[in-house]
Amino acid sequence: MASVFTDFKEGQQNGSGPRLAAALTPIATSQSPDRLLSFYNFSDSDHISADLRYSLFQANGVKLPKQEQNGWVDIFAAYWKAVGEIVKFEEYNPSASWAKVFDAWKNVANTLIRGYTNFGLQAWTVPCLYVVGKYLRVFAIKADTEISSKGAMAFGDQLQDDVAADFEKSAKLEEAARIINRMFTLCLSDRAPIEESRKWGIYNTTNLLFKTYFKLNSVGLSKNLLRALSASSADLPELEAFPKSHIVTFKYYVGVIHFLDENYREAEEHLAYAWNMCHKGAFKNRELILTYLVPCHLVTTHTLPSQKLLAPFPRLEKLFRPLCDCIRKGDLVGFDTAMFAGEEEFVKRRIYLPLERGRDIALRNLFRKVFIAGGFEESKDGQPPIRRTRVPVAEFAAALRIGTHADDRSRVDIDEVECLLSNLIYKGLMKGYIARERGMVVLSKGGTAFPGTGV
């Protein structure tokens, strides 16, 4: 109990939003494992408002305007009721329910929002929105899981309405998204001078909505947030003025949104920004960024990640290394095998399609070997030798047979080979043209036949 009121007192006296928000954290700490239980037991439903007013203000010596005091009393009264539902899990109470926890915490969120709109809570307290919004999402997911599992037990052998079932599966999280959206609007629409504005909370609430929309598989709704931010950009501080943690998360999600729209260059720009700013010790965050940055780089620059880059991330090393090795060697069968082996994870992460484009690079590397194996033309008049730039299509066809592990009975169609060559030329992976009447590929001279590879 003491820790809740101590956090509130020190937060108010020092003007520390994070310390104040700690008072509303709905979990016990290692320093105070009985924090929630003792807070709930300190009063009852008949006296909670009076007890809170005394403990928050009179006993603590915290002086605030009457209206603001009323707002905090209402918020902590709602918090007390939510804690009552949470501690049932600590006590192994059979009536414990995450759905009830969510409903009670939803009241905390709505009361906190009213505190800003009706009771004049100051802008420096917006970290309270971060904490309450974060756990609103957490409790919503737990509640939906609980409801879904109970529904499966109750209706295991009965017919169900699939459309309704899909909707109800995330009903609590949908509700949480609507409330967090109100927090977003609360921050974005504040007209106070920027020094004392809730606008400083805009990227944290945006990031929370991104996470929620992605969990709901409603990525399209995230674009509405970006449009709203763009429309209000003139009234917002520069992005660099916000905390790094807010910026990195925001840039990551914006990058992924562009990635899913197949705008890989824009995606790479945002993801690279997030990668460069991300704390070196934030292992999980850096791994998430690389999950999308590697495929982006593959598409935009046709280059592969180094072993040094992936070494600290064993999961990504296991995921990408087989593909990278096959691309580098021009092993088309090995590439197809690696894509099939990682298909489930690639589809889950939504990176399958850009990785599939790596087959073109593998084919480019296979055909590049043909070009290199062709050697040099005879030098004339003491000039340095230049590589043979006229290569028979039949040589590329032979390489394709090797790259696809074709047996002696398999036939490689020349028209198919010409089509593959044309595709590589069109995509800028080769420079030259096909002289069909002579069955020849004429490649550029001067080390530009295969751009970016040095030959």
UniProtKB/Swiss-Prot annotation:
Keyword DNA-binding: no
InterPro entries found in the cross-reference section: Csn12-like, PCI_dom, WH-like_DNA-bd_sf
Compartment(s) of residence: Cytoplasm; Nucleus
Residues spanning the membrane: none
One MF annotation (Gene Ontology) recorded for this entry: RNA binding
Protein's name according to its UniProt entry: Protein CSN12 homolog
Signal peptide (from-to): none
SMART domains: PAM
Family: Belongs to the CSN12 family.
Any single Gene Ontology cellular-component annotation: cytoplasm
Keyword Transport annotated: no
Domain PCI, residue spans: 248-448
